[in-house]
């Protein structure tokens, strides 16, 4: 899900109303590049446009936002990419996409080099017992795992897992989202375009692949649910609000919204950049902070129980902001040393 929820390593350029998110992204930008530089694709031109109608941010506000955050940009004639009168302003800047698979493999390789670490994937937790200041966790193969603390970083399942541990969850809503993978014409091959600030679209290179992703604020979320991730497709029994499955393996996932996204794209974009071709869809359940509905913030949420057995729950708003967890992990290690 994380790969779908954050397919771009952005600088925060699409959050002009989310200054706190931008601050955090910029704070950890260089650290992420240092740690995962091999995953980053910066070899394309990134364009950001302000829509002429129904944008929540205008030209002067967006330029003030970029200047305030020391983000370099140059203004470009909108007619080079867009149909007449569709956008108020167009900017060329530096942006990135990244390969989440490269990030994942690097982390897995790092874990494999560490002694006394066992990994379990695709494993369901059956029961959890709090005994003698330790957790006893029963997993579906009949084994028990005993530990002094738990870090819950399960993205869309964060509140589900917290409930298993009898811990409070975050105030969330859930979107069943679709990201389109598409083949683009040569005229768009090394270009990324984002239209703001409202129910518009973005088309960006997908890591180092030969494809682009196409997303739409209006069409990417198929269904919204709150306070639990409860969607009509779950009625078929492959998953439930208390046991989220892999949407991409599900036979009951929604029909694609590609045609609607393509139509929106072509309404804005100059005909010379038409001709995108559908390749596939990636579906996932995406958690959204209720508090961010108006501000568009994507802050990292962290809760910590400091009495044994210890428990940390984290929901990272953007891929590069997971470093916010550092201070909590250091505190947890010190607490464990004190036992």
Which ranges hold each PLM region?
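Glycine-rich FAD pyrophosphate-binding loop
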Residues: 1-2
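Dinucleotide-binding Rossmann-like beta1-alpha1 core, especially the glycine-rich loop
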Residues: 6, 10-89
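A short coil-to-beta-strand element that immediately follows conserved catalytic motifs
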Residues: 42-43, 120-121, 172-176, 271-283
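Central helical "cap/lid" subdomain
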Residues: 144-196, 206-211
């Amino acid at each position: 899900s994380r790969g779908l929820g954050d397919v771009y390593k952005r600088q925060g350029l699409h959050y002009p109303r989310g200054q706190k998110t931008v601050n955090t992204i910029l704070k950890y930008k260089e650290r992420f590049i240092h740690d995962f530089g091999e995953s980053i694709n910066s070899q394309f031109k990134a364009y950001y446009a302000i829509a002429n109608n129904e944008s929540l941010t205008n030209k002067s506000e967006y330029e003030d936002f970029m200047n305030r955050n020391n983000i370099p940009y140059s203004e470009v004639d909108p007619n080079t990419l867009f149909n007449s009168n569709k956008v108020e302003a167009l900017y060329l800047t530096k942006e990135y996409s990244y390969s989440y698979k490269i990030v994942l493999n690097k982390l897995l390789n790092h874990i494999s080099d560490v002694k006394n670490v066992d990994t379990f994937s695709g494993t369901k937790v059956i029961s959890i017992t709090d005994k003698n200041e330790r957790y006893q966790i029963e997993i579906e193969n009949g084994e028990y795992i005993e530990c002094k603390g738990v870090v819950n970083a399960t993205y869309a399942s964060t509140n589900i897992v917290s409930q298993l541990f009898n811990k409070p969850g975050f105030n969330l809503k859930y979107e069943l989202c679709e990201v389109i993978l598409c083949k683009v014409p040569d005229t768009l091959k090394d270009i990324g375009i984002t239209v703001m600030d409202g129910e518009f679209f973005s088309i960006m290179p997908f890591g180092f692949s030969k494809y682009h992703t196409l997303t739409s604020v209006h069409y990417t979320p198929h269904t919204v649910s709150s306070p639990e991730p409860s969607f009509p497709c779950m009625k078929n029994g492959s998953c439930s609000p208390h046991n989220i499955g892999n949407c991409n393996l599900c036979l009951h996932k929604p029909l694609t919204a590609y045609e609607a996204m393509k139509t929106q794209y072509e309404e804005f974009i100059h005909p010379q950049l038409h001709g995108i071709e559908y390749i596939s869809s990636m579906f996932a359940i995406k958690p959204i902070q209720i508090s961010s509905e108006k501000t568009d913030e994507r802050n990292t949420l962290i809760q910590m129980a400091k009495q044994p057995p210890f428990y940390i729950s984290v929901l990272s708003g953007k891929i590069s902001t997971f470093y916010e967890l550092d201070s909590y992990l250091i505190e947890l290690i010190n607490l464990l040393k004190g036992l």
